């Protein structure tokens, strides 16, 4: 989430996705106001730390001076497109994260569930990922070296773009991505609405996305290396640790890790969850 002025200038540092849990209070307030089932059926997603709507409400309550100056609420991709073309747009896949402001049944912004967050006019124009959002402006061309008038597509979230890059196009295709966090995408030909997962229209019309994600993955292995493998040179640590892990028997001799070291996203959606290691001698 990046609030920008009417001129397109950032008003604050961007707020991250599910790993940022600042809007827990606002999530509870919106669930009480609207009802969890109403939110799920209209938006396809439960309100969680992944949701942008509660974070906008947090901004409204905690940073009113910034909120009053907001021209648009953008995503990271929207901001890049805006800088290149002066157009404020967002793809439907990304917009589905704006629960409870995106209506999955009519593919549009909505304030039908609540009018307490922000006017829908201050949200970007909805388009499909592959549509042309605009063209590289003269100013952007001078700054980037791109040719003026180069067409710029709407784009999408990093994980969805990465999914396409490895061949996830149609129903039945799936990707699991390991990075700082873990993200999984399954493309389907019908909506799968489950409060334990995330839903979004897929990048291409007529298809749907069912997603899941863990809050810690690479960040956890880095933490382990820095705290428990200090004697190993950093440039060799992961190679050595991976080799040792490969020798572990099935079940790891009873060692169990609940990787909730930054709360957890799917399937428990609990920012207060804490990491636990069982079975240490």
Language-model features, listed with the residues they occupy:
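Active-site phosphate-binding/coordination module
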Residues: 1-56
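Nucleotide/phosphate-binding loop and acidic/charged catalytic motifs
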Residues: 11, 20, 90-96
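Structured loop/turn residues at beta-strand edges in well-structured enzyme cores
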Residues: 121
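Short clusters of small/polar residues that mark proteolytic maturation junctions
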Residues: 15-16, 93, 213
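Short glycine/proline- and charge-enriched loop/turn segments
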Residues: 9, 94, 200-202
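Active-site core segments that coordinate phosphate-bearing ligands/cofactors
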Residues: 31-44, 48, 54-89, 99-117, ...
């Amino acid at each position: 989430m990046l609030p920008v002025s009417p001129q397109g200038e950032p008003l604050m540092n961007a707020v991250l996705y599910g790993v940022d849990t600042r809007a827990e209070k606002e999530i509870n307030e919106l669930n009480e106001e609207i009802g969890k089932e109403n939110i799920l059926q209209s938006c396809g997603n439960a309100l969680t730390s992944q949701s942008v709507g509660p974070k906008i409400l947090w901004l409204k309550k905690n940073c009113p001076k910034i909120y009053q100056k907001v021209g648009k609420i953008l995503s990271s991709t929207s901001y890049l497109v805006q800088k290149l073309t002066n157009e404020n747009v967002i793809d439907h896949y990304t917009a589905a994260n704006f629960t409870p402001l995106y209506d999955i049944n009519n593919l549009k912004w909505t304030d039908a569930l609540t009018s307490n967050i922000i006017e829908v006019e201050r949200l970007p124009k909805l388009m499909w990922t592959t549509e042309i959002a605009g063209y590289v402006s003269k100013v952007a061309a001078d700054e980037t070296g791109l040719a003026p008038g180069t067409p710029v597509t709407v784009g999408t979230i990093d994980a969805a773009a990465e999914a396409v890059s490895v061949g996830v196009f149609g129903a039945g295709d799936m990707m699991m991505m390991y990075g700082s966090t873990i993200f999984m995408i399954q493309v389907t030909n019908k909506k799968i609405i489950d409060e334990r997962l995330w839903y979004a229209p897929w990048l291409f019309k007529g298809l749907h996305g069912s997603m899941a994600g863990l809050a810690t993955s690479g960040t956890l292995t880095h933490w382990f290396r820095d705290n428990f493998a200090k004697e190993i040179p950093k440039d060799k640590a992961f190679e050595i640790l991976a080799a040792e892990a490969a020798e572990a028997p099935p079940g790891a001799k009873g060692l169990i890790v609940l990787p909730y070291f930054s709360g957890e996203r799917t399937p428990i959606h609990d920012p207060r969850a804490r990491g636990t290691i069982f079975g240490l001698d």
